[in-house]
Curated annotation (Swiss-Prot):
Disulfide bonds: none annotated. It catalyses: Hydrolysis of proteins to small peptides in the presence of ATP and magnesium. alpha-casein is the usual test substrate. In the absence of ATP, only oligopeptides shorter than five residues are hydrolyzed (such as succinyl-Leu-Tyr-|-NHMec, and Leu-Tyr-Leu-|-Tyr-Trp, in which cleavage of the -Tyr-|-Leu- and -Tyr-|-Trp bonds also occurs). It comes from the Bacteria. Fourteen ClpP subunits assemble into 2 heptameric rings which stack back to back to give a disk-like structure with a central cavity, resembling the structure of eukaryotic proteasomes. Belongs to the peptidase S14 family. SUPFAM superfamilies: ClpP/crotonase (SSF52096). It comes from Borrelia garinii subsp. bavariensis (strain ATCC BAA-2496 / DSM 23469 / PBi). One of its GO terms (molecular function) is ATPase binding. This is ATP-dependent Clp protease proteolytic subunit. Pfam families: CLP_protease. InterPro entries: ClpP, ClpP/crotonase-like_dom_sf, ClpP/TepA, ClpP_His_AS, ClpP_Ser_AS. GO terms for cellular component: cytoplasm; endopeptidase Clp complex. PROSITE patterns: CLP_PROTEASE_HIS (PS00382), CLP_PROTEASE_SER (PS00381).
Amino acid sequence: MHNLIPTVIEHTGNYERVFDIYSRLLRERIIFLSGEINDLKADTVIAQLLFLESEDSNKDIYLYLNSPGGSITAGLAIYDTMQYIKPDVRTICIGQAASMGAFLLAGGAKGKRESLAYSRIMIHQPWGGISGQASDINIQANEILRLKKLIIDIMSNQIGIDKEKLALDMERDYFMTSNDALKYGLIDSILVRE
């Protein structure tokens, strides 16, 4: 989150309540995920998803994404929770959804994955720094390959694209405009003012 968090004053009867903007938006079932995806952010998003499900398991949850990506395991924890809970999770890209951010964008409920017009989306294969003994490097390399296959399997199912094409596109950074992402199947619509 940010160092300076705006507050909102809500007037109810004779009382005033001050909320930080994120808590106020959470009351409207809106979650923000911005910046690098890590374990701390994943824990926060997962807690918010579970809380909103307990509040009303039939109303959609809105997950706004502006992320360059991050930890695969943290992203998979968020994705698993999105698929586990009963409410549909609408995903909306604002700014960018790259790497694990794009994976989460595509992981929204089918028909409810959206982007603002000038956002950018980027997919690529998992990467990580490996060091240590030769046997440890081999173990880590095998795990990265396993995660790559898992991400491709999940994404190809989620967006309805051939696994081989997706794997080929993910070999290098593959940038898309919102229109490109719509054609690709990563999103279902582009949000514009009516």
